[in-house]
Amino acid sequence: MVDDDVALLRVVREALVASLQCEVDTSPKPEYAFELALKKKYDLLVFDFQMPMIDGAMLFFLIGKVYQNIQPMREIPPLILISGKAEETRAQELLKEPGVAGLVAKPFAINRLLEKIKACVPGVEDAAR
C-alpha cells in the first residue's frame, strides 16, 4: 500500500504495476490508509513521512498497535518512508525503529523505490522477466 501526495500516488502506482508483479493499493489520506491496513493483509507499506493530520511514522505505529491487539494477531509489514526531509534527525532516527525498512528521499527516481521494495518483499519479480 502506498500513501503519499495524489500526483505522486498515480506515478508510483503506475510504475509499480508496470515494473513488478504485485498488486498496489493507494490512499490519498492517512485515515483511509489506516482503514485499508485493517481490512487487508499487505506485504509492504510505503508512507510519506509528512502527511496532513498524522505523519507516516505515526500511522505505521498505530497500525502496529492495532495488529498486536486483534485476534489472531497480525504481523505488521515493513515500512518504507518517503520524505522530502530525509536528512532531518527524526527521519534518520526512524530508520532505527523496528519494522522501518528504508527511507527514500524526494525527489527520487522510481528505480530507487523499486530497489527498496525488492529488498523488502521476497518474491517480488520484475515484470520483464
Regions found by a protein language model. Give the residues of each.
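Alpha4 helix (beta4-alpha4-beta5 surface) of REC/receiver domains from two-component response regulators
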Residues: M58, R74-E75, A86-L103, N111, ...
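Short amphipathic alpha-helix used as the core "switch/output" element in two-component signaling
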Residues: E35, A57-R74
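A Lys-centered signature of the CheY-like receiver
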Residues: K106
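Hydrophobic/aromatic residues positioned on beta-strands within the core alpha/beta folds
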Residues: I82-S83
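Receiver (REC) domain active-site loop signature in two-component systems and cognate sites
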Residues: M51
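Helix N-cap/capping motif at the beta->alpha junctions
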Residues: T26-E35, G56
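Active-site residues of response regulator receiver
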Residues: D48
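Two-component/phosphorelay signaling modules centered on CheY-like receiver
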Residues: V6-D25
